[in-house]
């Protein structure tokens, strides 16, 4: 998709904020801990290539979701280790080997299919995934893990790491977290062959359970300056949100009492009022459920009225602003602030989704 470079809606990404957030976490964990920066899903909407280049000196490796995301980084000149967190198809192994990309292996069945496609796994680097209770992918017993590591080693693959993922590290109730931690710890301690890298800590674990870190962490939402728990748990130290979203008024009019606005005529003016139009809509990731929420204009919270359209939305104005007046959708203006977490609360979702849904139509502008 082509970014709309000639439309005044833009996401500004502060790369120094991302670097500062990484350093903030690193200051609170052991200096010997390896840091993996998670840049999957286009770096949570921030731009994978630009973020990876900006933090290359601060981290030891990168995590992505799939082979295409890994290849994108390699083609952009990223040389550090890249771990694919998802499972790739066995016929994609040659590409992973060619580009020195580490893959996740999650089952003995996958290994059998891999050996059927690729007899020699001598140049393949892998991490073994353990399902300690997340319920998605991974081996679920010590027997499976030992069998898989032995089979991979016998086939010539380099088993560089073993890892798991916690389902509830960002919640107040820690029972499930400690169940998963105990399962994974016991399994790792009992392995016949123990890989060098052992990691279980995502952003939430690194923040609130730093005493449970093994020897590597996978930092995702935290490096972009957001709280993984939303508003459930307080951050143990400050983070800097890296992304702001702004637009400009492109049309302003005065409407009379009784006039309607938008699809379905869902908004009817009760009095004479000013209405402004912004060039952003649900095709940009500003979803229809944002009707009734606010944006910031000149320090004023201005309500979104009428339904959000594909490419435009309308807001009620306190006065007749000039065409081109800047509008803040995510970020701070004066004493007013709207965060991705605030928007997530309005939508009944999580801040991750708010950022990931910002489409490629919105150009990213990088500072610092």
Swiss-Prot record:
<dbReference type="GO" id="GO:0008784">
    <property type="term" value="F:alanine racemase activity"/>
</dbReference>
<feature type="active site" description="Proton acceptor; specific for D-alanine">
    <location>
        <position position="40"/>
    </location>
</feature>
<dbReference type="InterPro" id="IPR000821">
    <property type="entry name" value="Ala_racemase"/>
</dbReference>
<feature type="active site" description="Proton acceptor; specific for L-alanine">
    <location>
        <position position="263"/>
    </location>
</feature>
<dbReference type="Pfam" id="PF01168">
    <property type="entry name" value="Ala_racemase_N"/>
</dbReference>
<protein>
    <recommendedName>
        <fullName>Alanine racemase</fullName>
        <ecNumber>5.1.1.1</ecNumber>
    </recommendedName>
</protein>
<feature type="binding site">
    <location>
        <position position="136"/>
    </location>
    <ligand>
        <name>substrate</name>
    </ligand>
</feature>
<dbReference type="Pfam" id="PF00842">
    <property type="entry name" value="Ala_racemase_C"/>
</dbReference>
<comment type="similarity">
    <text>Belongs to the alanine racemase family.</text>
</comment>
<dbReference type="GO" id="GO:0030632">
    <property type="term" value="P:D-alanine biosynthetic process"/>
</dbReference>
<feature type="binding site">
    <location>
        <position position="310"/>
    </location>
    <ligand>
        <name>substrate</name>
    </ligand>
</feature>
<dbReference type="GO" id="GO:0009252">
    <property type="term" value="P:peptidoglycan biosynthetic process"/>
</dbReference>
<dbReference type="GO" id="GO:0005829">
    <property type="term" value="C:cytosol"/>
</dbReference>
<dbReference type="InterPro" id="IPR029066">
    <property type="entry name" value="PLP-binding_barrel"/>
</dbReference>
<dbReference type="InterPro" id="IPR020622">
    <property type="entry name" value="Ala_racemase_pyridoxalP-BS"/>
</dbReference>
<comment type="pathway">
    <text>Amino-acid biosynthesis; D-alanine biosynthesis; D-alanine from L-alanine: step 1/1.</text>
</comment>
<comment type="function">
    <text>Catalyzes the interconversion of L-alanine and D-alanine. May also act on other amino acids.</text>
</comment>
<dbReference type="InterPro" id="IPR011079">
    <property type="entry name" value="Ala_racemase_C"/>
</dbReference>
<keyword id="KW-0413">Isomerase</keyword>
<dbReference type="InterPro" id="IPR001608">
    <property type="entry name" value="Ala_racemase_N"/>
</dbReference>
<keyword id="KW-0663">Pyridoxal phosphate</keyword>
<dbReference type="GO" id="GO:0030170">
    <property type="term" value="F:pyridoxal phosphate binding"/>
</dbReference>
<dbReference type="InterPro" id="IPR009006">
    <property type="entry name" value="Ala_racemase/Decarboxylase_C"/>
</dbReference>
<feature type="modified residue" description="N6-(pyridoxal phosphate)lysine">
    <location>
        <position position="40"/>
    </location>
</feature>
